[in-house]
Amino acid sequence: MLRTSLTKGARLTGTRFVQTKALSKATLTDLPERWENMPNLEQKEIADNLTERQKLPWKTLNNEEIKAAWYISYGEWGPRRPVHGKGDVAFITKGVFLGLGISFGLFGLVRLLANPETPKTMNREWQLKSDEYLKSKNANPWGGYSQVQSK
């Protein structure tokens, strides 16, 4: 007896029926293109209407409403807007390669105009004498003190 009364009550409170009408196709057509330019009040109204429609079974929603609900929830607008526009990536890439080209060109020019003679401290004789001097002073006995650079 108690069990039958509980099951009858459960059957009566099963589904919630919200009295909402479908949004017009004119409201939802090209929503991603128009969304940014719409007034905030109209954006809020469309979002609220779609929220109410989503409380119904999803089979009652048409494709335009599903696409609009997805775009409002997850689309590329507001904080999800891409950081770079369509032509920005190519512009940045060209700028990076231009900067690298100028850098390498400037480096080559400086090397070309630099003194072609090597400094006297890069001479092998100088480096051997530096080794002898450091050995006489007992400099860095653990790690070594070799000043000779192999070529």
UniProtKB/Swiss-Prot annotation:
GO annotation terms (biological process): mitochondrial electron transport, cytochrome c to oxygen; proton transmembrane transport
Cellular localisation: Mitochondrion inner membrane
CDD domains: Cyt_c_Oxidase_IV (cd00922)
Presequence extent in this chain: 1-17
Family: Belongs to the cytochrome c oxidase IV family.
Subunit organization: Component of the cytochrome c oxidase (complex IV, CIV), a multisubunit enzyme composed of 12 subunits. The complex is composed of a catalytic core of 3 subunits COX1, COX2 and COX3, encoded in the mitochondrial DNA, and 9 supernumerary subunits COX4, COX5A (or COX5B), COX6, COX7, COX8, COX9, COX12, COX13 and COX26, which are encoded in the nuclear genome. COX5A is the predominant subunit V during aerobic/normoxic growth, it gets replaced by COX5B under anaerobic/hypoxic conditions.
Protein name as annotated: Cytochrome c oxidase subunit 5B, mitochondrial
Organism: Saccharomyces cerevisiae (strain ATCC 204508 / S288c)
UniProt gene name: COX5B
